[in-house]
Amino acid sequence: MKQRFSKRTRLVSALLTLAMVCTFLPFSAFAATGDVEINNTNFPDAKFQEYLKTATRPGTSEQIDKNGDGILSAEERNQVYILDVEKSGIKDLTGIKLFPKLSTLKCSELGLEKLDLSENKELYTLYCSKNNLIQLELSQNTELTYLDCSGNKLTQLNLPVGTKLEKLICYDNQLSALDVNSLSGLTNLSCGKNPLGTLDVSNLASLKSLACYENDLTTLNVKNNSILKDLSCGGNQLTELDLSHNPNLTDLYCSDNQLSQLDLRQNKKLTTLECFQNKLELLDVSQSTKLQTIKCADNQLTSLDVTKNTALNELDCARNQLVELDTRNNVALKKLNCESNRLAGINLDDNVYLSDISVGSNTYPAEMKSDRTVDLSKLPNRFDVERASFWYGGKVEGNTLTVNEGVTQVRYQYSYKNYLTEYFYLDVSG
């Protein structure tokens, strides 16, 4: 009897102790399964509290706090699938973990410095761009398919192994390294404006769009990315770029690098090519007949054949060394910049849609004979002496230019399209 009483006493004592502990536990201790009070303990940010008290769930007229009692029940919290707090003034999203069913979070432009979403394991889409984030915790978010964390101060980005991520936008941060090897389902990667020295995308067979511009890359291997359509790698230090395994490429932006050659023979679907500010001496675009835009200014090109690019509507080949440019077949051309080359003249009469034209500052190195004459009939690019007038520095009779003594450069006006004229120059300095 004594032993039975002793067991009962111990059981009652244990139950009383448990009751006392539960009595003094705060609401937050039951956050995972029970009610959560909208207070400073659970949600330190006052504006976040106000949002939770007054905001409605997207797509409904119901408030998040349905009965307005300042307490979120488990049912109320579990019905929060989308939170859009962009530009709301909230500075701290502590308490976000209390919404376990959250699938979409939009929290851009808030000034957030830290964001821990490790307990929001059903998160599918995350927009947290243009904050001041130095820490982003996503180690448990394996369901994440879309992440935009651009415009922050992140020095590292640790993504969960096995994540379903399809689109990763992390440009304009401070990332010196980025490991995307495990993201086999990634289709879009935008990581420009970071100090990345290397980038390995060899495992990303599903990649369709890659933007890695304005980094510190010296090499870029895209041989395994056969379905790649859009590549933006400008503003790096690339000396070569092999695109022979990218037949689906439609848009290429590789300007401001150190490329001395660019082989586009396998890129027959290209519609946009921007390769300005490189060291290109040759550029063969004859196989890329679908090109609509070519920007190849500030290179070292001595020739450019665009006769097969009949869909072309914009051409910028300024500041090269071109002596010829035939645009007769480019009937759709609307914009042309060929200034600062070596053209003696140009005829654009066939380009009836051309309205934005820059042809100035062209100087052709002409051969002057010992008698100070230049045979104008030998000038390239279909030079027509009848289109030239107002010669300064010499006199023209027929196709012969006689250069004045002491003159090293002759100037003249040239009618390049109907009644439009521009000054061209002949360098006769020898």
Model-derived regions, located:
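Long, contiguous interaction/targeting segments characteristic
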Residues: 202, 265, 274-276, 285-286, ...
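Consensus "Asn ladder" position of solenoid repeat domains
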Residues: 88, 110, 131, 152, ...
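Canonical leucine-rich repeat
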Residues: 93-96, 115-117, 136, 157, ...
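Leucine-rich repeat
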Residues: 77-79, 98-102, 119-124, 132, ...
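Non-core capping and flanking segments associated with repeat-based/extracellular domains
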Residues: 138, 147, 180, 210, ...
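Conserved hydrophobic beta-strand positions in leucine-rich repeat
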Residues: 83, 105-107, 124-128, 145-149, ...
